[in-house]
From Swiss-Prot:
Belongs to the NrdI family. This is Protein NrdI. Transmembrane segments: none annotated. GO terms for molecular function: FMN binding. It comes from Mycolicibacterium vanbaalenii (strain DSM 7251 / JCM 13017 / BCRC 16820 / KCTC 9966 / NRRL B-24157 / PYR-1) (Mycobacterium vanbaalenii). The gene is nrdI. Probably involved in ribonucleotide reductase function. It comes from the Bacteria. One of its GO terms (biological process) is protein modification process. InterPro entries: Flavoprotein-like_sf, RNR_Ib_NrdI_bac, RNR_NrdI.
């Protein structure tokens, strides 16, 4: 299991990063809606950085509207397992801040952040991190399935 769901704006930076990963991925469209049917890790860009006083989660604007609409679907939100955010280090503390917001609001781990299209090191780190993440998730799921426990 290595499902990714991602959003990329017309800049295509996040799309390029996801392509480099070489993993199964579903793109949230710029126009229109989708629904997913399997657990996934969300990859998204961060918008609107560069505020003089640092991150302000009450201000909004960090998470793309398309991602908000996707996560406002209760079914989609129920399947998110983690988040990875893209950003720009020029924005200081707001670098990858969309990941912080989604992590807090959805109660999932913020797994990684990368700059713009990511580096080769980012690609390797995310690939390995996702392999480990899904292996741990499968192990946890195996240990907690009631049907298997009833047979013991």
């Amino acid at each position: 299991m290595s499902n990714l769901v991602y959003f990329s704006s017309v800049s295509e930076n996040t799309h390029r990063f996801v392509e480099k990963l070489g993993l199964p991925a579903t793109r949230i469209p710029i126009h229109g809606r989708i629904q997913v049917d399997e657990p996934y890790v969300l990859v998204l860009p961060t918008y609107g950085g560069g505020h003089a006083n640092g991150p302000d989660p009450d201000r909004g604007g960090y998470v793309p509207k398309q991602v908000i609409a996707f996560l406002n679907d209760e079914h989609n939100r129920s399947l998110i397992r983690g988040v990875i955010a893209a950003g720009n280090t020029n924005f200081g503390a707001e670098f990858g801040y969309a990941g912080v917001i989604v992590s807090r609001k959805c109660g999932v781990p913020f797994l990684y952040r990368f700059e713009l299209m990511g580096t080769t090191d980012d690609v390797f780190a995310v690939r390995q991190g996702l392999t480990d993440f899904w292996a741990d998730a499968r192990k946890d799921q195996t240990c907690h399935q009631p049907s298997q426990l009833q047979n013991l």
